[in-house]
Amino acid sequence: MKKISLAFCLALLSSLFCLAQVSPLQFNKNGEFKIVQFTDIHFKYGNPASDIALKRIGEVLDAERPDLVVFTGDVVYAAPADTAMRKVLSYATDRKIPFVVTFGNHDNEQGKTRAELYDVIRSMPFNIQPDRGGVESPDYVLTLKSSDGKKDAALLYCLDSHSYSKLPDVKGYDWLTFDQVNWYRQQSAAYKAKNGGQPLPALAFFHIPLPEYNEAASDENAILLGTRMEKACAPELNTGMFTAMKEAGDVMGMFVGHDHDNDYAVMWKGILLAYGRFTGGNTEYNHLSNGARVILMKEGARTFTTWIRLKGGEIIDKTVYPDSYMKDDWRKRPLVTE
């Protein structure tokens, strides 16, 4: 019994030591911070159909060398879920890249609860999520420090969008709760006050798209860039997270997964509603070659560049927020004679 306890303590200390070695997230000397988003990996441990997903993850990380990796849900798709989760996340840990995970609706269907999987994720080196604190799967906000390390320069909100509706007369997927909306409002207000009354530039990451994705995609005047091959499978009920973010004024864009045949981005009332790129193999429906979304933030500016990276280093749909999604005033264009 003593040997088991000692081994457990050593493993725990080793994990804590690795966690302690992760430097604070910070803009580099060029004022840039790069994020890679992987989504809907649907990894099945030991299934050859998932090999291409792991290969693509490795290729993207080696090519982009990001400052942070965000896995936006449906990471694992078969038991053993804990082993599968560790395998996928090892591609970040082996490269010593900080990472976080937001759960999808399928992650806890493989024999492990959200709480159990959260603890597995937290035990991995270079994971920077907070402790659960008794909550099954907490929401959290990551701060990006300025390039000189002296102040908070940007925020990343990471939310659990849950799984399925718990109301018998409401079908489909679950929604962000009022408690989550209130939590976001409180966090945003606190950072705004700390920043002299100015909202910090922010992004949000979660799995299931908000209902506003369908509103924006159906607007004939909206500029939609990327691929849209299916309607957003959003919750039937709208609890106001988009409105809260619009009112707070910090979130520039939100990034989701869930719908494998979408990778588009569209502006809606000043906020970019974007999908990641399906990263998985042929273990679930898909009609897009797998890849990842990359986001490059700029310090001190409400702008970012984003693109999709695919097999063999191919880059598509490179856009700049907000400029790529806004129509210019044609009356002010310089005279063109040819």
Placement of each model-derived feature along the sequence:
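Active-site-proximal beta-strand elements of phosphoester/diester hydrolases
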Residues: 32-45, 153-162, 205, 272-278
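His/acidic metal-ligating clusters that form di-metal
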Residues: 65-67, 155-157, 170-263, 329-334
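N-terminal active-site segment of His-dependent metallophosphoesterases
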Residues: 20-87
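Binuclear metal-dependent phosphoesterase catalytic core
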Residues: 38, 143-145, 150, 241-248, ...
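Active-site environment of divalent metal-dependent phosphoester hydrolases
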Residues: 44-46, 77-82, 101-112, 164-167, ...
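Positively charged n-region of N-terminal signal peptides that target proteins for export
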Residues: 1-4
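Extended active-site neighborhood of metal-dependent phosphoesterases/phosphodiesterases
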Residues: 86-196, 293-298
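Bacterial N-terminal signal peptides
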Residues: 7-16
